[in-house]
Amino acid sequence: MSKSLQAIRGMNDILPEQTPLWRYFEGTVARLLDNYGYKQIRMPIVEFTELFKRSIGEVTDIVEKEMYTFEDRNGDSLTLRPEGTAACVRAVLEHGITGGGQVQKLWYIGPMFRHERPQKGRYRQFHQIGCEVFNLDGPDIDAELIVLTWRLWGELGIRDAVKLELNSLGTAEARARYRDALVEFLSARMDKLDEDSQRRLKTNPLRVLDTKNPDTQAVLVDAPKLADYLDEESRVHFEGLKARLDAAGIPYVINPKLVRGLDYYSKTVFEWVTDKLGAQGTVCAGGRYDGLVEQMGGKPTSGVGFAMGIERLVLLLETLEQVPEEISRQVDVYLCAFGEAAELAALALSERVRDQLPNLRLQINAGAGSFKSQFKKADKSGALYALILGDDELAQQVVGFKPLRGQGEQQSIAWDALAAHLATCVVQG
């Protein structure tokens, strides 16, 4: 196949054998968010470039090196969204849904785009589920977001594989004081910093704390600590969050180097990390951004949220073998029909069954075929049971019912009793 007809590097097709697990994960998260009172919002995947420069920060790696930006026919600079928070804030501002102090608890799902080096768990098109809450400024809502994700990990069976890391960045004023102290400390040791950290020191000093370079990490051991520069408001907020997590029985560790890669965060920041996926260990991250709405032209409005990477969490489910058996099976019952009259009856019969069992995954054989070939298809489909409809069954208005997995003899079931029988065997099963 020529290169022009291949997917773009780092942008992957999600094939039919993969989508059931994606749908299971997405459905589990959506149900949980609904139960917690969050409402879905859908934003465009393309925004004006200025939105991300104003929100994420012009000197961040995302804006400087990773965004997919282009000029449209009107001469406007547009960007494929690299993250969801800025677009969500733009939407609530544009439509005025947080005006007058209205509390909004929102969630979204969709693709994001960053021009990074593709590797396992990191792609140029990736998918996120995000939550954003506006006009609640206490630590209780920060705690709720974390408790919600903790419950999700439990439902997915991955709770033992993830760890919660917490930090507080303080207010913008506290962070500015700390930034000055950090720059002074590191500038005196510039020759000991790696090249990337030297660049970050000039553009976004707090990101030096993110470094993976062992020499720079050694320098940071004696660096000023952000916690020593927190204002009283931020200290009280952070202590309130920790108290709520302690009360809920959620374990966490304080990571003083956790700063996040986006400029808009303040006070609470958190990450859920795992050591099961190699270098790409962050599966969910978020925090508070109380100044972002005002920064983007709105009135002072508190905000807090998180985003989780679907690719990484699906990969974690597969790695830990936490894929429910029914998810990998896409068919419950396979109906084999032999002869033209049986094929006609099969379609009508299957629709009657679907009327009574709307959640039954029933597949009818298509393309005719011999008894042997149809049973081979039935087995390959992963179905639990095969239904057999031929001339003899048609004459008696019955179907053959044959278990395909495990023990059980074939038996005849009257058409009128078929739905009830399937409900017992499959739906209640």
From Swiss-Prot:
Keyword list, A-Z: Aminoacyl-tRNA synthetase, ATP-binding, Cytoplasm, Ligase, Nucleotide-binding, Protein biosynthesis
Enzyme class: ligase
GO molecular function: ATP binding; histidine-tRNA ligase activity
Any one GO BP annotation for this protein: histidyl-tRNA aminoacylation
Pfam families reported in the protein's UniProt record: HGTP_anticodon, tRNA-synt_His
Compartments, as annotated in UniProt: Cytoplasm
InterPro entries hit by this protein: aa-tRNA-synth_II, aa-tRNA-synth_II/BPL/LPL, Anticodon-bd, Anticodon-bd_dom_sf, His-tRNA-ligase, HisRS-like_core, HisRS/HisZ, HisRS_anticodon
Catalytic activity entry: tRNA(His) + L-histidine + ATP = L-histidyl-tRNA(His) + AMP + diphosphate + H(+)
Cited PROSITE patterns: AA_TRNA_LIGASE_II
Chief location category: cytoplasm
EC number: 6.1.1.21
GO cellular component entries: cytoplasm
UniProt xrefs under NCBIfam families: hisS
Entry's family note: Belongs to the class-II aminoacyl-tRNA synthetase family.
Quaternary structure, from the entry: Homodimer.
Name the UniProt record assigns to this protein: Histidine--tRNA ligase
Organism, as annotated: Pseudomonas fluorescens (strain ATCC BAA-477 / NRRL B-23932 / Pf-5)
